[in-house]
């Protein structure tokens, strides 16, 4: 699977919603023969550690400012309690750019409201 899959992480992220997806993308065990597992990179508005709804602390690997749309295979937007807040506008704008460039955007649960 060419390109990188970016997982957006943020305070209040619903950490349980990404478990099956990230496990299968990372392992590639159910991919068609010949396809390699996906590279998943955590992406944050900045590199400040976030706290998920389940209390996990995650430090984003890259910030939104460092993100390169050109090597993006997909963007995963997990659910959470802050999707209607102004703080999410920058990632929603980037998600719109992904869609314009025919990149996959996977919005889960609360992320569909953004």
Which stretches of residues belong to each language-model region?
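Short, thiol/selenol-centered motifs that function as redox-active sites or metal-ligating centers
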Residues: 108-109
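Extended, subdomain-level signal for the structured scaffold at the beginning of enzyme domains
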Residues: 1-101, 114
């Amino acid at each position: 699977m060419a390109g990188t899959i970016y997982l957006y992480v943020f305070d209040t992220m619903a950490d349980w919603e990404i478990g099956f997806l990230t496990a299968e993308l990372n392992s590639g065990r159910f991919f068609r023969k010949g396809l390699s597992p996906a590279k998943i990179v955590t992406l944050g508005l900045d590199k400040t550690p976030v706290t998920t709804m389940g209390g996990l602390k995650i430090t984003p690997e890259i910030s939104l400012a460092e993100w390169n749309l050109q090597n993006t295979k997909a963007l995963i937007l997990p659910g959470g309690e802050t999707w209607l807040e102004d703080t999410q506008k920058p990632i929603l704008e980037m998600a719109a750019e992904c869609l314009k460039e025919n990149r996959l955007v996977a919005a889960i649960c609360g992320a569909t409201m953004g």
